[in-house]
Amino acid sequence: AGLLRIVPPETIIGLADDDMYYYPNWFKASVDLMRSYPNVGQVSGWPVRTQMRWGNNFTIKWARKYAVYEEGKFIPEQWDRDFCTSIGREWDFHVHYTKNDMDKRITYQGIPAYAVAHHCQFVCKAGNLVEILRQNNEAMSDDKVLDNAVDGAGFLRLTTVERYVRHIGNVLDDELKPKRKRHA
């Protein structure tokens, strides 16, 4: 948090776990989304359905008032399968575990986003993160604590509808192995 206090508040920073894979244009897509919505606290580049269980109450409340809000199964099955592979979860268990979960998608001024961000990877304005840490000095101590702190501070948490980032769980699967050289 000390470094955040010396950079200008409008500086866009990125935080991520070390086992993330980035597709081309991930940063631009995230920043473009951030600039398309008001009062954004976080933008992630990969939607995960189970993440939509917490930390998005403010975003959903805002969306119902100012945007188009939809619930459904919008995330492609393959992305769900990739998520399962990255965390070592069996597909059949995941299908059962998430059977009642719905994706929460919003559209504001023609720009779609998911109503969630992921603590494993996000971009934000440095000043917003400083404000969140002022309100909750334990926000960086746990993933859900951060997610809920951003939500509780009244910031939108968004994810691109296209997958620009992917959790790889420190293992490259057969699809990602050939890409490691191309994007290095």
What kind of feature is each model-predicted range?
Residues 2-12:
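Active-site nucleotide-sugar/metal-binding loop of Leloir-type enzymes
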Residues 9-10, 38-40, 155:
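Short, high-confidence coil segments that cap the C-terminus of an alpha-helix
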Residues 19-21:
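Acidic metal-phosphate-binding loop of nucleotide-sugar-dependent transferases
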Residues 23-125:
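Conserved catalytic core of nucleotide-sugar-dependent glycosyltransferases
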Residues 78, 86, 91-184:
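C-terminal catalytic/acceptor-binding lobe
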